[in-house]
Amino acid sequence: MPSHLNETLITLIPKHPGADCLVAFRPISLCNTVYKVVTKIIVKRLRPFLPKLISPLQTTFVPGRMGLDNMIITQEIIHTMTLKKGKTGFMVIKIDLEKAYDRLEWHFIRDVLELYRLPPPLIKLIMSCVSSSSISVLLNGGKPERFHPSRGIRQRDPLSPYLFIMCMEVLGFLIFRRCEENLWDPVRASRGGQAFSHLFFADDLVLFAKADLWNCNSVRETLDSFCELSG
């Protein structure tokens, strides 16, 4: 990807009236039209394969799935938990990954794409789209000097949501491994029914586990491991 096609303007949109600090603004990336065409072509090629690549526990951005499905499952699990009897209950943890797109390390994204065994030329093109960008912040109608990011993927980039959910599958794998090693006790909606340890909602996730110190430590260690891997 030629660098001049990957120049990006960032404009700050206030999240609420009277925004007076940086965290109260949402950065929106204004990308080159040619760049958007290239990334949309990549997305169009990737989308048909996502149902096979992405776990059923992620329902956002995957063709044939609806985010409402996970909301219904979550409500049913919580309802079941309120009816359970026993000395030890279960817990639900909702996690909002702050600045999730901004913190992904580029080497981690490449490792995930290679893990999915995408064709090397496609991986090279995707990583060129991700890593060759230069950014200017649109401020009071002016465009200051450009700078080059060293990590993260851009908000409002057509490719970004799909890269993100592919990266989140690594967290799902870490959770499944904990469950298989009996280090994480998931929740069952019914006796003999499917066990649920987590559900994904794009960049949010809901975790289910037994409410004891052992599981709390396991949840924390799993999240720490993912943060260390992904940045």
For the regions a language model picked out, list residue spans one by one.
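Nucleotidyl polymerases of mobile genetic elements and RNA viruses
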Residues: M1-G231
